[in-house]
Regions:
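Amphipathic alpha-helical interface elements
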Residues: 2-82, 101, 151-159, 164
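Enrichment for repetitive, rod-forming helical segments
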Residues: 27-30, 87, 117
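Charge-enriched, short contiguous segments at helix-coil
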Residues: 89-156, 160-163
């Protein structure tokens, strides 16, 4: 997704790039939930209400005002990061709140874009800035930094072909 977002920026498709970057930020939270708590929210599965409540401290179990569909919680992006913070070091990611606060305004740019809920265009500079922040988030999630993420992205990048 990160490489794909980079290609979209190169093509001048900034809203498309930011939509992919938004999904990348959400995917980081989903992977952390699966990795740390065994809670599978990939493929839109939703979080099973009982599983989530059992992992949270009792004083936090009623904190989340979320939609419930077929016995599963449907969490938004912000709520996934809050949940990771609230689950604590054993089942969560204590840095999650700090990470989300650092990208929250940028994620709002996606929400205001034509590909989401608004009509405000995303500029090239905004897309590139968001891309850098998302690389950093991926690196922090892996606990090995954005440089490692950049290196990994180079290994999966499409080869450049020049046509004459």
């Amino acid at each position: 997704l990160l490489c794909n977002a980079g290609r979209r920026i190169e093509e001048g498709k900034y809203e498309d790039a930011v939509a992919r970057l938004y999904r990348s930020v959400e995917l980081v939270a989903q992977i952390k939930l699966l990795e740390k708590a065994g809670v599978d929210d990939l493929e839109g599965a939703g979080l099973r209400a009982g599983v989530v409540c059992n992992l949270l401290p009792k004083e936090m179990q009623g904190r989340y005002q979320v939609r419930e569909v077929d016995g599963k919680f449907v969490f938004g992006l912000r709520q996934k990061y809050e949940l990771l913070k609230d689950l604590g070091p054993k089942y969560g990611w204590p840095k999650a709140d700090e990470v989300y606060r650092g990208i929250q305004a940028d994620m709002e740019k996606r929400n205001r874009s034509v590909l989401a809920h608004g009509i405000t265009p995303v500029t090239k500079e905004e897309a590139e800035q968001i891309q850098e922040k998302v690389r950093d988030i991926a690196g922090r999630a892996l606990d090995n930094g954005a440089n490692t993420v950049r290196d990994a992205m180079r290994t999966v990048a499409f080869p450049r072909v020049e046509w004459k």
